[in-house]
Amino acid sequence: MKTALLLKTKSQPFDPYVEAFEKYGRDTAFIPVLRHKRVHEEQLRDKLKNVRKTYCGLIVTSQRVSETLDEALKQEDETERQKILMETPIFTVGPATDDSIRRLGFQQTHGKDCGRGEVLADLIEEWYTTTKQHKPLLFLVGEKHRDIIQRKLGDDRVDSLIVYATQELENTETQIKDTIRKHPTIDWIVAFSPTSICSLLNTFELKIATIGPTTGDYLKKLGTQPNVVSPAPNPESLASSIVAFDEENSS
């Protein structure tokens, strides 16, 4: 069974990329390249305590934020926690994030089929028009994030809070080489973010994929042409694109 090496931390307790690749008869291996540290935890808890009074909903666009939100919700009184889960609309940017949010227990999710921030921003604008809401949305983000949603919707509709910071891990190159040596079935390496290891991807003699255009463009600037740039930043799109490339280029 061929294996895709994903340069990301494996999500717990369930990583949707495993299932997506298994669907196409492929295995997955994971190597984290970033360390994630929760920040502004007290501010997040304070905002959650008043979330239904202050905001008309939440925006979550990554599984890392979903995990941070889960930890914050565990600090809430069970009655209040259930009210938040049942009554708070929450916008996600694709099926992977939507699934992680639903696993937390949120009932009112929107944006599963959006795929990109620009599309989600349009959906939110339509939602505001339909529901006639006047309160802003609480947008939970990482330290490094694209601001397309905030720019399109404006500060009066989006209140952003950084809930985690990232730092590149050391010795990633050595870990990748060791993993490739131990697992000769690895034929793809997938980059999920613009990090220093991207400058070395073409030295591993594997096919290269990226989760989206931001990382894809970063690789091109470094002189590396990815074989696949996933059309949408989600597991199904990535896995199907890799399989399609292999089928088109099989001898």
Swiss-Prot record:
It holds the Pfam family HEM4. It is an enzyme of class 4 (lyase). Pathway: Porphyrin-containing compound metabolism; protoporphyrin-IX biosynthesis; coproporphyrinogen-III from 5-aminolevulinate: step 3/4. Its EC number is 4.2.1.75. Residues 231-251 are annotated as: Disordered. Keywords: Heme biosynthesis, Lyase, Porphyrin biosynthesis. GO terms for biological process: protoporphyrinogen IX biosynthetic process; uroporphyrinogen III biosynthetic process. GO terms for cellular component: cytosol; nucleus. Gene3D superfamilies: 3.40.50.10090. It catalyses: hydroxymethylbilane = uroporphyrinogen III + H2O. One of its GO terms (molecular function) is uroporphyrinogen-III synthase activity. It comes from the Eukaryota. Catalyzes cyclization of the linear tetrapyrrole, hydroxymethylbilane, to the macrocyclic uroporphyrinogen III. Belongs to the uroporphyrinogen-III synthase family. This is Uroporphyrinogen-III synthase. It comes from Schizosaccharomyces pombe (strain 972 / ATCC 24843) (Fission yeast). The gene is ups1.
